[in-house]
């Protein structure tokens, strides 16, 4: 009988160890490339680069304006790689304004400063102080209203753009570097601690017609944060690892285009990107929406659904095993090269 109990304990220990190793080494339903074939509907096939789609905002004289972007690519400056988007989409001409948010959602967050920015309020000022999940809820609401108005392209819905989609619109197919006419397209007074955001569309647009891609508020992207820019075909980072998922901050996502570029050294020409905690609400961070294939938004929602909270002690164990695994992998590689 004692032998039977001991065998059961050993079996249970082995199963528990295997389960822990799977938890540590298997990343789950991670996605790094969007393999999407959007429906070839008439309104997509007939659209041309730069075509404008306008959506009525309930109880507002202003319209939400989006610009059509056909499939394209752009070079990654430092690495020499290229990033390619193989399907068309629409991106907001402006950052989402406070009026657009309030009319669609019925509320505006109470300004509670978490950083040194001053919150500037007004109908045409960019929306800020919103979390990642709240931005996705806003996109779902836009999709619902656009469908009711009969203007939603078949097979498409509103979502946050991926980092690559944002950068293609910013770069206009060229290198993702700061423009020579920076003062004409972006606000340059970030050094003033009392300065908040400005009304959208006050600066010149880029070559494809987008305003405030630099220099107003940071703009949230759909990607989970990664330390470097991705490249390749339809890249996206929906992989949870120790770089973007931690016990004290939760999920971290990417934001682009903020005014921190005024501190960038002269020899650093790439546009700024920042790590943003998904649950945070900052006066310096807002959003710009995109119309993307439904599959893209569904994949994001499905990925987020699988991000269940993990106890701190279990994450500590996971990190320990990851370190051991990385050490053993390096050690084995060294031995095989001898």
Regions found by a protein language model. Give the residues of each.
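Active-site microenvironments of metalloenzymes and redox enzymes
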Residues: 83-183, 222-233, 291-303, 309-314, ...
């Amino acid at each position: 009988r004692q032998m039977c109990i001991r065998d059961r304990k050993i079996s249970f220990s082995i199963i528990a160890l295997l389960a822990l190793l799977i938890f540590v080494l298997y990343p789950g339903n991670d996605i790094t490339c969007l393999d999407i074939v959007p429906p070839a509907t008439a309104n997509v096939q007939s659209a041309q680069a730069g075509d404008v789609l306008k959506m009525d905002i309930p109880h507002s004289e202003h319209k939400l304006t989006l610009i059509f972007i056909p499939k394209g690519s752009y070079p990654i400056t430092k690495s020499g790689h290229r990033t390619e988007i193989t399907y068309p989409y629409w991106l907001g001409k402006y950052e989402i304004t406070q009026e657009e948010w309030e009319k669609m959602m019925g509320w505006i967050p109470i300004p509670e400063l978490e950083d040194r920015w001053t919150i500037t309020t007004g109908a045409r000022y960019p929306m800020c102080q919103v979390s990642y999940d709240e931005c996705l809820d806003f996109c779902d609401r836009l999709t619902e209203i656009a469908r009711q108005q009969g203007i939603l392209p078949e097979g498409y819905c509103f979502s946050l753009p991926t980092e690559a989609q944002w950068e293609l619109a910013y770069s206009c197919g060229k290198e993702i570097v700061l423009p020579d006419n920076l003062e004409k397209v972006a606000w340059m007074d970030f050094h003033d601690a009392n300065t908040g955001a400005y009304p959208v569309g006050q600066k010149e647009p880029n070559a494809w017609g987008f305003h405030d891609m630099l220099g107003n508020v940071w703009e949230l992207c759909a990607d989970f944060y990664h330390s470097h820019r991705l490249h390749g075909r339809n890249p996206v980072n929906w992989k949870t690892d120790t770089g973007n998922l931690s016990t004290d901050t939760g999920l971290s996502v990417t934001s682009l285009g903020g005014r921190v570029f005024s501190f960038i050294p002269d020899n650093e020409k790439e546009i700024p990107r920042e790590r943003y905690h998904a649950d945070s609400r900052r006066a310096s961070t807002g959003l710009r929406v995109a119309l993307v294939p439904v599959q893209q938004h569904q994949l994001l929602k499905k990925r987020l659904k699988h991000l269940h909270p993990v106890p701190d002690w279990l994450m500590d164990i996971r990190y320990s095993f990851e370190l051991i695994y990385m050490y053993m992998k390096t050690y084995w590689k060294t031995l095989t090269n001898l």
